[in-house]
């Protein structure tokens, strides 16, 4: 937003609602080009400048409003210089420019909402591991949890309708509608894989913008109800949602849902105590109350998706589990609540008592079987976990091979440093170390035993992780303290992405 704020010259008369003229401004596509298109393989052999990019987009928008948009006239010299008609390239240019423009109202609303308040920049909250300390504090006091897959709209028109609440410019929304219908096969954009939606590699920034707008709308309603549950008792759709296009279409279904399902049990809304966590394409709802509360939220979510987002969701696929009896697969960990039993001796005057003390603790375990399956898919071991050589890396240098294995080993060690039990992590590191040795032995046409005997175990010093080195420097003389800290949980607050090996959910 700061890059092109000087170009916009927006005043207080809500000029930012008119976004359509920005599609024909050259600097918009200069920003988009610098952000993404400069790294695109489609432009490697093409002389691209801001002027030609602007003219190409202008021609493309004009063609989108006519039926014969695939015919290139003799006067389109810029298109001819750019090469023959390339549908993917034009789609890339339009989508990147569209994201730059559509982010303007979101950024302006954020700035206006934070005006007069101090903006606290907490970069550590961006880390994936920042969620786990929250779970350690909250989950031991909760009873029930539901792991829900967030459904995605099956039709692009729903996304256009969602953006109408944020963008008031009808021309821009009309252009978005034309673009989605002409240049995208919606079924190929996202594909369900193990209940997690994965975007195609085409225009990732554009698709992430659409996805985030959809999730933002969904979570704004959900969190509004979570924070103010008394609003669920309202029977009028007009006073429930401030969504213009929502009233006429599904007023009857909204009244039916909230009158029949919610107002019959007013005590249900007095103390919801609901916690919400979202990660990737899933969300977690956890509560301390009875299963009735969880079932009410379950069917509310289903009605919300079907009536508001026109997305079908099966109630049988939303499971409500008791935390003390079921584990939760969350961000590559098996998380569960474990009871730590201890006996405390209490003495009062001459009488002594033995008191059983039970404390709940969040147990985070390394999923050994899925990780071995991921290692087997990448040819580090077989299906049983026996290490094998990585033949595709045998042509690289020795240092390159060691660096590759050590990099994977360090990443896994950092990510699973918060595990309650490290034995599974040690087994994964052992598989990678032995696979590295077998790869080097294969390269030098030698056996593993002869190779290690000739070079020694110092060859694998690269596999020592950073936390081992740092803790050994902090506690050089207290070996027992060093081992105790290393065996404990260490949450790294600088992890912004998940390794492919961990991405097994």
UniProtKB/Swiss-Prot annotation:
Usually encoded in the trnK tRNA gene intron. Probably assists in splicing its own and other chloroplast group II introns. It holds the Pfam family MatK_N. GO terms for biological process: mRNA processing; RNA splicing; tRNA processing. Transmembrane segments: none annotated. It is found in: Plastid, Chloroplast. The keyword tRNA processing applies. InterPro entries: Domain_X, Maturase_MatK, Maturase_MatK_N. This is Maturase K. Keywords: Chloroplast, mRNA processing, Plastid, RNA-binding, tRNA processing. One of its GO terms (molecular function) is RNA binding. One of its GO terms (cellular component) is chloroplast. Belongs to the intron maturase 2 family. MatK subfamily. The keyword Lyase does not apply. HAMAP family: MatK.
């Amino acid at each position: 937003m700061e890059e092109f704020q000087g170009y916009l010259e927006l005043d207080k008369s809500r000029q930012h609602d008119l976004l359509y003229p920005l599609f024909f401004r050259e600097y918009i596509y200069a920003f988009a080009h610098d952000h993404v298109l400069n790294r695109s393989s489609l432009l490697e052999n093409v002389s691209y400048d801001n002027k030609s990019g602007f003219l190409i987009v202008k021609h493309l928008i004009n063609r989108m409003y006519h039926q014969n948009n695939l015919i290139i006239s003799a006067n389109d010299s810029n298109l001819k210089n750019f090469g023959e008609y390339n549908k993917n390239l034009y789609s890339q240019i339009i989508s990147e420019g569209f994201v730059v423009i559509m982010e303007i109202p979101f950024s302006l609303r954020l700035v206006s909402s934070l005006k007069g308040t101090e903006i606290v920049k907490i970069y550590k909250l961006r880390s994936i591991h920042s969620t786990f300390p929250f779970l350690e504090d909250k989950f031991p006091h909760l009873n029930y949890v539901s792991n829900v897959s967030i459904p995605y709209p099956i039709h692009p028109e729903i996304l256009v309708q969602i953006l109408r609440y944020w963008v008031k410019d009808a021309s821009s929304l009309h252009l978005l509608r034309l673009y989605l219908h002409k240049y995208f096969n919606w079924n190929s954009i996202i594909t369900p894989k193990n209940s997690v939606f994965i975007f195609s590699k085409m225009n990732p920034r554009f698709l992430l913008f659409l996805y985030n707008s959809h999730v933002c709308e969904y979570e704004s309603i959900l969190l509004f109800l979570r924070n103010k549950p008394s609003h669920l008792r309202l029977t009028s759709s007009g006073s429930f949602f401030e969504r213009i296009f929502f009233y006429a279409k599904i007023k009857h279904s909204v009244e039916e849902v909230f009158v029949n399902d919610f107002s019959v049990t007013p005590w249900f809304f007095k103390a919801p105590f609901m916690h919400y966590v979202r990660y990737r394409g899933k969300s977690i709802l956890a509560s301390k109350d009875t299963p009735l509360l969880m079932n009410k939220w379950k069917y509310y979510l289903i009605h919300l998706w079907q009536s508001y987002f026109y997305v079908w969701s099966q109630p049988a696929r939303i499971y409500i589990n008791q935390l003390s009896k079921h584990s939760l697969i969350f961000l590559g960990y098996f998380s569960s609540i474990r009871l730590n039993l201890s006996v405390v001796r209490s003495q009062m005057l001459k009488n002594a008592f033995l008191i059983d003390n039970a404390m709940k603790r969040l147990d985070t375990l390394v999923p050994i079987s899925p990780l071995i399956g991921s290692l087997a898919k990448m040819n580090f071991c077989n299906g049983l976990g026996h290490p094998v050589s990585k033949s595709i890396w045998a042509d690289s240098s020795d240092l390159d091979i060691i660096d590759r294995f050590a990099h994977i080993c360090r990443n896994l060690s950092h990510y699973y440093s918060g595990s309650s039990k490290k034995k599974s992590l040690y087994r994964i590191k052992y598989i990678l170390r032995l696979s590295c040795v077998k790869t080097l032995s294969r390269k030098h046409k030698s056996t593993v035993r002869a190779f290690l005997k000739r070079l020694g175990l110092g060859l694998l010093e690269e596999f020592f992780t950073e936390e081992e080195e740092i803790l050994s420097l902090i506690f050089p003389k207290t070996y027992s303290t060093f081992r105790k800290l290393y065996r404990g949980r260490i949450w790294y607050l600088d992890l912004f992405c998940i390794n492919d090996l961990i991405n097994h959910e």
